[in-house]
Amino acid sequence: MADEPHDQRPTDVIKSYLPEKGPSTSQVLAVVTLFPLGAVLLCLAGLILTGTIIGLAVATPLFVIFSPILVPAALTIALAVTGFLTSGAFGITALSSISWLLNYVRRMRGSLPEQLDHARRRVQETVGQKTREAGQRSQDVIRP
């Protein structure tokens, strides 16, 4: 009997699992303010769900009755919106292409004189070398 501890109460065992100190004041205030807010939002969500279900119940027969009109109208609107979006995309593509082309032409126009000078120097060097070679050949022909 001495080896069995009977002096512990069941509440002491439960309290040993609980933390020593309780929640802070800010935690209590957060729960007190957020709990009613959550309840109000849950009620609003339920009301919106109820309204949606009632609206579908009322509108479904109207959709069925007017579907020969609504389906082609919806398709027409969808195609028109798709056309406008595609037109806008093509317009943006055209503007960006023209912008790239203008920038390319400006860059080429700025570097064109440099390229012409480089080509002129190469032609002059080639002509000068050919002239020297022709002079050498003529001197070789003159001196037998």
UniProtKB/Swiss-Prot annotation:
Expressed in seeds (at protein level). GO terms for biological process: lipid droplet organization; lipid storage; response to freezing; seed maturation; seed oilbody biogenesis. It is found in: Lipid droplet; Membrane. The chain crosses the membrane at residues 28-48, 53-73, 75-95. Residues 124-144 are annotated as: Disordered. One of its GO terms (cellular component) is membrane. The modification N-acetylalanine is found at residue 2. It comes from the Eukaryota. Its main location: other. A motif (Proline-knot) lies at residues 61-72. It is a multi-pass membrane protein. Pfam families: Oleosin. Signal peptide: none annotated. Keywords: Acetylation, Lipid droplet, Membrane, Transmembrane, Transmembrane helix. The proline-knot motif may be involved in the targeting to oil bodies. May have a structural role to stabilize the lipid body during desiccation of the seed by preventing coalescence of the oil. Probably interacts with both lipid and phospholipid moieties of lipid bodies. May also provide recognition signals for specific lipase anchorage in lipolysis during seedling growth. Belongs to the oleosin family. This is Oleosin H2. It comes from Sesamum indicum.
